[in-house]
């Protein structure tokens, strides 16, 4: 049987107190809507329709290519939101999943089990329910004396007895598609909110003698709907625990999972060790047997096997096998370290490629440079690559030795096996195997110090 999906992403999210549409707030580096769409994609959906409304264009811009969407111009309730998908889905034969775009913790495994249960029960509607420790704010599942689902009552419409019920509606359903769209033509706004409730179709089905099933979630956390920043932080914490657990099961050592923040799209190889207070974000790849020490931050980068990142920041950069950085180094966007490169204390590199075995041990800035193999940078080396308007490139060939406190005024080229003397200001190309000395001659003026303000006498 064909499977369809409707993802509800039209709400403003007033309680978020944000200019950003609620479904675009991020959990573990990815929008809540993106998490939901990923889970939906795991159950072989034939047609997926996203309902957009508030800030529709911003939401549409984030959708995967080819995703169908419908704009809900007026937010008149969940029933209305589903009904406006009729032109795309009403005539289809099959089962339709309806899910909110602010439920980032729901898994593809759960959705697959929900479809299986729906088909096994031969139901017209199947509700994903959960037993809530505190059901306040949720719609309650009302069952008859035989235990069958009778209806769903929203919090604002519930009486005291109904409010005491702990089985709640998670807001995720599967319906027989044609039955759903027929029932949606019968719902009204006769309720406390003055809205078209999707949940009213359950009562319509029940009165028609159709089968209503309820599948109870094993993990209540999956049902979390995010309506404010408190719930957003709860979702973030739960997702982080889930992500960290998966990495540890796959052979990654996390010294302190409670202070380790790893985004959902990060890949990490076995035998890697990650110390406390580490943040790894975006589409980052980390290979096998990597050490990442306390306080490091890595974002959208590739760190290949046997590398070390010690108390450092790596952004949009690539570290090849066996290279190491830190402590307190900063690889800025566009940096590429070849194999066995060493970048040490207080070194900043941007938009540069360093060849195999090159070393920049301390207190160095390398920007817009192409550096060969086994080049040595002395402490205090600066590539002066910016004149206030334009950036300029520096080329340094294999085996060059850059003396301490050298200032390299780009654009220029330093040849193979060349050497710059310590303290040089390099303003011209340096040929292969040449020694460059670009500093003023030292002059000692004997006795002159006695006339200087610092002088303290014998």
From Swiss-Prot:
Pathway: Nucleotide-sugar biosynthesis; UDP-N-acetyl-alpha-D-glucosamine biosynthesis; N-acetyl-alpha-D-glucosamine 1-phosphate from alpha-D-glucosamine 6-phosphate (route II): step 2/2; Nucleotide-sugar biosynthesis; UDP-N-acetyl-alpha-D-glucosamine biosynthesis; UDP-N-acetyl-alpha-D-glucosamine from N-acetyl-alpha-D-glucosamine 1-phosphate: step 1/1; Bacterial outer membrane biogenesis; LPS lipid A biosynthesis
Region described as Linker: spans on this chain: 230-250
Annotated stretches, region: Pyrophosphorylase: 1-229
Cofactor binding note of this UniProt entry: Binds 1 Mg(2+) ion per subunit.
Localisation: Cytoplasm
GO aspect biological process, one term: lipid A biosynthetic process
Protein name: Bifunctional protein GlmU
